[in-house]
Each structure stands twice: as C-alpha cells, then as structure tokens.
Amino acid sequence: MVSKELSKEQRQKRIQDIIARESISTQGELVQRLRADNIQVTQATISRDINELRLVRLPIGKGRHRYALAQMTGHTDVEEELGRLFQNFVHDVDRGENMLVIRTADGHATGVALLLDRLRRDDIVGTLAGEDTIFVVARTTLEAESLMEEFHALMLG
C-alpha cells in the first residue's frame, strides 16, 4: 500500500477525528493508528501536533487516560474543570517572588496550564508546562501570593 501524503492541516484534522471517536492513550498509539490508515508520521510530529491542537489527557479510570480536545465554552466551564483538575491531579504549589511552580501527577501539567491560559487572567503573565510541572509567572509578587492562596484552595476543593 502507498502511504498517504497529508498536509499538516489535513493530518491534524485526521487526529481530531480519531480522538473524537476512539480512546487513544499515548502518542505511540496515535502514531500506530495513523499508520494503520497508511499515514506515515513520527512521534516527534505527533508530539508537536498534540501541542498545537491543545489536546488534553483526561482520566478514564484505573490509572488510564485518553486524549481529548479541550472544549470549554465559557469561563465558568473552565473554572469548574480547573477546580476538578486541581483536586485530582495537583500535588503541590510553591512560590518564589512572582513565580509559582505547580507540581501535578504525570501527564497532567499541560491540561492544567491550558485551563489557566484560557482564563486569560490579568494577574497571570503566562504559563509553561512540562510533563508534571507548570511554571506560572504572575504580574507582581503580591498577585503571586494571592494566586498561591487561590491554588491551595482549589486543591482542597
């Protein structure tokens, strides 16, 4: 069989279609799924696509997760989901001056950071997420203190 040559937009649309219909837990599974459709991709390409599409990993039980599109419509939806994620997956929040570090369960930092970004708060300059750590830059030291209190409250529910 001949592999299909897709544009980036076509490939990303195909990824969205797959994760909307199927439970895909890892980048490797997504690579295999695309290859089953004769779409040749590398895991590095899939990693970039996941970031650009702002996919999040949602828990599906028994320690497993699946990729999903973050489909928050309103500010309240984002706040509710952020609270749920903080209660379930955030382990620690620490602060130094106007910077905060949020430690999460493996694989959940990106989803939490995405929701923080979607709030578009004036007191948050920006976020940077890895696998289990989020770096949050607050506008001022005072705002960082306030954010830390707010994040601790979210952790407690």
Curated annotation (Swiss-Prot):
InterPro entries: Arg_repress, Arg_repress_C, Arg_repress_C_sf, Arg_repress_DNA-bd, WH-like_DNA-bd_sf, WH_DNA-bd_sf. It holds the Pfam family Arg_repressor_C. Keywords: Amino-acid biosynthesis, Arginine biosynthesis, Cytoplasm, DNA-binding, Repressor, Transcription, Transcription regulation. One of its GO terms (molecular function) is DNA-binding transcription factor activity. Pathway: Amino-acid biosynthesis; L-arginine biosynthesis [regulation]. One of its GO terms (cellular component) is cytoplasm. GO terms for biological process: L-arginine biosynthetic process; protein complex oligomerization; regulation of arginine biosynthetic process. The keyword Cytoplasm applies. It is found in: Cytoplasm. Gene3D superfamilies: 3.30.1360.40, Winged helix-like DNA-binding domain superfamily/Winged helix DNA-binding domain (1.10.10.10). The keyword Transcription regulation applies. Its main location: cytoplasm. Regulates arginine biosynthesis genes. Belongs to the ArgR family. This is Arginine repressor.
